[in-house]
Every structure is written in C-alpha cells, then in structure tokens.
C-alpha cells in the first residue's frame, strides 16, 4: 500500500508548543478554523475571524501558523492521521456485514470532525494548483485503503470472485467523499441511513446473497 501523503513536508511550521496553555491555544485555533471553514468556506474566513472565534489575539495566530493556508494543511494532515489509525482487522466471529457497518460508521464519524477542513480544501484547491495535486495524492491513498479492505473481505467465505476489485475500490472511495460532502445538510438520522445504504450496497457488491451468516475467521 502506498504511504500516506505528507502534506507538511515542505512547510516551515513553528515548533510544537511545550507549555499546556500554548497547546490549548493551538487547539482552540484549530477548532475555530474548522467551525468557520464549515460555516463560511475558505475565502470568506479571515485570520482575524479565526483568532476572534478562538478568543485570542490575532498575533497569537502567527505564533502557531504562518498563514491560513498552512493551518488548512495542518487540519487536513490531522484528518489523514486520524484516517490512518482506523484498523481494518476484524474481531474473530464477526460477520462481514457487521464489520463493514462498523468500519463505515467509525470512518464517517472521524471524517465529520474535519468536515470544515474538507470543504475549505475543496474550495481552496480550485485556485491553488499544489492543493489540487495534493488532493490527487490523498484520493490515491484513500482508494488504496479501500482496496486493502476489499482484498481482506474477498478472502471471507461467500465472497464473489468475479468482480473487478480496483474499479470497485475507486467507486466506493468516491462515494465516501461524496457522502461526506453532502452530510453538511443532513440530520443525524439521515447520516445513519446513508451509512446503512452504503453498507448494503458494498456488501452485496462483494458477497453472494447466501453469505449473510458467514463469519470472519
């Protein structure tokens, strides 16, 4: 599997704060940016507004980040880190359907925490070629992770052997990002309904209709 994109490799970030109060301020800036990016988008959110939402002076922002763009990179890096920590290893005796539902729910819960960053990134990359290139790398990485999951599930009893696994991984990854984008206008019940629908769709793309009771070893 390809390595996770390193969005900060060329960034000159201020050092990680050592004092607890400074770490708390950095966290407040991140939370404020996520909220404002979600509410107003990237261009309509200013550094001054981020600092104000965090109840901090504008100068404090520059002690932690050199620009709004750098903060966006940090937030997306945080999202990728959280995504990389999602384990695909199933517990013994769990059904593939249950595993899929649990994985999708955990992944979606993680992604929703960074919805503001995702929406800001999608906007910013329209006028920032480097962010657009980074987005291609992100998508290649997330598609590879989906492919790894499908490869694992394909080994389970009852799995179909006649489907094209790579194109299916790309379709599922595209579906996941699309659901995240649309979730901003959904209620919690609607989000769970979409997760259930995605689980059903993916499961029946991989497993025969008679495989429902099979368990992973």
Regions found by a protein language model. Give the residues of each.
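Helix-turn-helix
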Residues: 28, 36-70, 74
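Generic hydrophobic, amphipathic alpha-helix propensity
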Residues: 22-34, 50-51, 71, 75-83, ...
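Hydrophobic alpha-helical connector segments
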Residues: 74, 88-116, 165-172, 195
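Amphipathic alpha-helical packing segments from all-alpha helical-bundle domains
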Residues: 81-84, 109-113, 129-155, 166-170, ...
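N-terminal intrinsically disordered/low-complexity leader segments
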Residues: 1-24, 210-217
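Short, hydrophobic secondary-structure boundary micro-motifs
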Residues: 118-121, 133-134, 162, 188, ...
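Solvent-exposed, amphipathic alpha-helical segments
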Residues: 28, 32-40, 82-90, 171-182
């Amino acid at each position: 599997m390809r390595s996770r994109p390193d969005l900060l490799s060329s960034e000159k970030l201020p050092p990680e704060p050592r004092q607890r109060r400074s770490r708390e301020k950095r966290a407040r800036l991140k939370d404020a940016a996520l909220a404002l990016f979600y509410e107003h988008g990237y261009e309509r959110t200013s550094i001054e507004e981020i600092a104000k939402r965090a109840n901090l002076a504008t100068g404090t922002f520059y002690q932690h980040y050199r620009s709004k763009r750098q903060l966006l990179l940090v937030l997306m890096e945080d999202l990728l880190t959280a995504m990389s920590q999602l384990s695909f290893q199933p517990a013994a005796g769990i059904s593939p359907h249950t595993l899929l539902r649990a994985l999708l729910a955990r992944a979606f819960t993680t992604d929703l925490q960074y919805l503001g960053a995702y929406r800001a990134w999608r906007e910013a990359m329209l006028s920032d070629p480097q962010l657009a290139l980074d987005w291609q790398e992100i998508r290649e990485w997330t598609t590879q992770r989906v492919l790894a999951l499908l490869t694992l599930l394909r080994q389970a009893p009852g799995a179909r052997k006649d489907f094209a696994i790579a194109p299916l991984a790309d379709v599922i990854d595209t579906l996941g990002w699309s659901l995240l984008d649309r979730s901003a206008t959904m209620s919690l019940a609607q989000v769970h309904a979409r997760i259930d629908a995605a689980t059903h769709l993916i499961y029946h793309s991989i497993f025969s209709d008679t495989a429902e009771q099979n368990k992973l070893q």
